[in-house]
Structures are given as C-alpha cells and as structure tokens.
Regions:
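Short hydrophobic beta-strand micro-motif common in sensory/regulatory domains
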Residues: 222-226
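N-terminal helix-turn-helix
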Residues: 2-103, 107, 233, 263-271
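Short, solvent-exposed recognition segments
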Residues: 2-7, 11, 18, 146-217
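Short, structured helix-loop boundary elements
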Residues: 30-34, 90, 103, 107, ...
Length: 271
C-alpha cells in the first residue's frame, strides 16, 4: 500500500458544484415556468445562500418573478428561508438527491470493487458517470493517508479536465460530441485546451485503455482512469486521484488494478 505524509499544499478544494464552462441545458419544448424554477435552483450551486435580488439579477428577471418562484419552491421544501430572509437549498431537495444516489445501480455494483482498489493502493478512488459534457463523481472513497483534494465539492467536472472524462468520451460518442460543442476552457495548467489535443488524448486512450492527467483540474494533482464499458460503450469510469508525487510513480501498479476492477464492474452491472 502506498504510504505518504500529508502535503499541506494539497487541501480540499473549494470548487463550485456547477461547471461554469458547461452550457446550461435549454428548455426547448418545455414549460417556461418550470425552466425558470430549475434555473433558480441551479443558482444555489454557486452560492449557499441567496436573496431575492441576487436571484433576480442572475437570471435577468423581475424581483417579483424571483420572489414568486422562491416562495413556491419554499412551499414544497425545495428551498428554505433563514432568519435573515435569504434562501438556501431545502431538505426535500436533499431527500430526492439521496434517493437518486441510492438507486444508482452502477454505484451499488461498483462500491465493493472500489473499496478493494482503495485498500490495495491507498489512493482516493472515484466512480464517474457521464452527464452531457461533464463527468459526475457519484461515489468516492477517500485516501487513507489523509490527503484530501476534492472533499464534498468538485463532484462535477468538465470531461476535458479529468482522466475520467477523457476515458468515457473515448468510448462514448455522445460525451465526445457534447464536450466538443462546449469547448475546452482551461481550468489548471494541465487542462486539455485544443481540439487537436482532445483528439490525440482520445486516440491514446483507445490504444492504451486508460488515461492519465496531471494538473487537469487541480494543480499538482494527478488522476488515472479506466472506462467501465457495457456492450462497448463507456457508462462510467473508475479512477484514482492524488498528489502527483504519489500517483505518477505508482501508475504501473495502479493501471492493471483499475482495469481488472472496471471489467468486474461492467460484468456484474450488465448481468
């Protein structure tokens, strides 16, 4: 098992749950009022508390509209108002989110396999699934050495900023297409920034079966990922993440473990 001392320069990163580089989903063909309510909820991905004026300004709507939507959402428990009059996400939204999390079949299959990889490597292990142009980490087992990089934030990342996103896009045309449409804005010094580099990375993954990214999302952090493929298409990824000095020298040992884990998850998930 990899051993390491805590690096004070690698701490839990304060990062928004929402990818500002990713276009928000449209509401073409849907109800405008529902779209507005969802836009209001998404405002809270950037800030824990917001006032009526804050929401109105961000969405470009009248304060009266923002107030009506917030009042309706509060009545259903999706937001709640504190003593100062500001709003925050409500417990009912948390309940629904936990139900979605608990009912994720891939997560149920992957969790014991992830734990085995964590025990063998000592690194943080992530399960990523695609969502549009992004990858969302639906499960995480933290490193035993106390080095925390993501903590409870950073659950959603643009696909081009993570090894998980790259390996999924290499075997999932939909993710590849969505990321190309969204572009490749830089996030850290190792972020893929050009379509030519994206093409090269996907070709490399298809040849080698895994991806490694250094300082893709966070400076001096590295990750290695392998796709979880069902009927040839990537439905997720399993990866390890940690400070670059720990991950880089351990890649030769880690990649076969991740490959075996991904194959086991895919076999059980598709059974």
């Amino acid at each position: 098992m990899t051993t390491a001392t805590h690096d004070p320069s690698i701490e839990t990163v304060s990062d928004s749950a929402w990818c500002t580089s990713t276009p928000r989903r449209g509401t073409a063909g849907g109800l405008r009022s529902v779209g507005t309510a969802l836009d209001v909820l998404e405002c809270f991905a950037m800030d824990s508390t917001l006032g009526v004026s804050d929401v109105a300004r961000r969405l470009g709507v009248a304060k009266s509209t923002a107030h009506r939507v917030l009042t309706t959402l509060a009545g259903r428990g999706f937001v709640e108002q504190d003593a100062s009059g500001s709003y925050r996400l409500g417990l009912h939204l948390y309940e629904l989110g936990m139900l979605s999390h608990a009912r994720n079949g891939l997560r149920h299959v992957a969790l014991p396999v992830m734990q085995a990889v964590a025990d063998q490597t000592g690194h943080t292990v992530n399960l990523g699934v695609p969502d549009g142009a992004d990858v969302v980490f639906v499960e995480r087992i933290e490193s035993v050495d106390g080095v925390r990089i993501l903590g409870h934030t950073g659950r959603r990342q643009p696909a081009h900023c993570t090894s998980s996103g790259v390996v999924i896009a290499a075997f999932n045309p939909g993710v590849d297409r969505e990321r190309r449409h969204a572009g490749f804005p830089p996030k850290a010094k190792g972020t893929i920034r050009r379509v030519e580099d994206w093409d090269r990375a996907l070709t490399d993954v298809r040849r080698r079966g895994h991806a490694a990214l250094h300082s893709g999302s966070f400076t001096d952090a590295s990750s290695v990922a392998v796709p979880i493929r069902v009927h040839g298409q990537a439905v997720g990824s399993i990866s390890v993440l940690g400070p670059t000095p720990l991950i880089e020298p351990d890649m030769r040992r880690v990649v076969p473990l991740l490959t075996a884990a991904a194959n086991r998850i895919a076999k059980q998930y598709s059974a």
